[in-house]
Amino acid sequence: MTKHYLNSKYQSEQRSSAMKKITMGTASIILGSLVYIGADSQQVNAATEATNAPNNQSTQVSQATSQPINFQVQKDGSSEKSHMDDYMQHPGKVIKQNNKYYFQTVLNNASFWKEYKFYNANNQELATTVVNDNKKADTRTINVAVEPGYKSLTTKVHIVVPQINYNHRYTTHLEFEKAIPTLADAAKPNNVKPVQPKPAQPKTPTEQTKPVQPKVEKVKPTVTTTSKVEDNHSTKVVSTDTTKDQTKTQTAHTVKTAQTAQEQNKVQTPVKDVATAKSESNNQAVSDNKSQQTNKVTKHNETPKQASKAKELPKTGLTSVDNFISTVAFATLALLGSLSLLLFKRKESK
């Protein structure tokens, strides 16, 4: 008996079910992507409409200028206030748009106003347009075409109030507080083109950059003078920063001060006779011999110090040689270790 997973019928069923699953998964993915794309496009359209709406509104407002104006509705043939005045919002507004003038007013209880007509002084009917009809607030905004200089308008209305069974037609006249003024033209919006940023151009090097040279500070030796009298025969002793050379300078300083003292004695004592001159020359010779002996002693003392300095120098050459030998030895050991591992693996494989 063959197992069920070796049966050809079972295998074909498994293939068909797998194909169905793949097809359903692909279809669901495509459908989901289409839904997502559609929702995204709707959001983009809504965003563009939202951005265009204020732009259009601002364009319309910018093309029109307005000014408030007060008025009163009076009964026909008298200056008595009419009840119609209570059903209109005050003040009104004079609007100039596209070089045309309009008187704009808002009617309260708009559902009561079944008919309204406006006439000028020559009994010519004026065009009336509805700007906004708010059913919820029961108000209606209308524009009546007028001309600058109009002082009053004649109105004929038909009012119906079902609650009190009121249905009446009557004529009134609308008196402006002042004549319709002449308004200035609206400032046209400047179409400012967006400034496109220019690509930054690389600056051409005008001057070659010079390498920065390290500054070398010159050490100025300090000069110590023996006395003020030594104008012609001044002795200068250079003092260094190291403490080991101070002994050398001190010995040289003592020797030279002795010589300068003797020379001063020579200058101060006048030459009276040959005997005194000879005695002075003998004294000078003796002092010179002493100074030479002291110089030899100081040089002899300096030689062990110089030798000690030579001993203190670092062995840079030896350390570099030692490092090279150690690296070569380490590399050789590593190579031998790798070769031994390779031979060991070959033996194991055999």
Swiss-Prot record:
The gene is isdA. Residues 317-350 form a propeptide. CDD domains: NEAT. Keywords: Cell wall, Heme, Iron, Metal-binding, Peptidoglycan-anchor, Secreted, Signal. Residues 188-314 are annotated as: Disordered. Residues 252-268, 278-296 have a biased composition (Polar residues). This is Iron-regulated surface determinant protein A. A motif (LPXTG sorting signal) lies at residues 313-317. The lineage of its organism: Bacteria, Bacillati, Bacillota, Bacilli, Bacillales. Its main location: secreted. Belongs to the IsdA family. The keyword Iron applies. It is a peptidoglycan-anchor. Residues 1-46 form the signal peptide. Induction: Repressed by fur in the presence of iron. SUPFAM superfamilies: NEAT domain-like (SSF158911). It comes from the Bacteria. It is found in: Secreted, Cell wall.
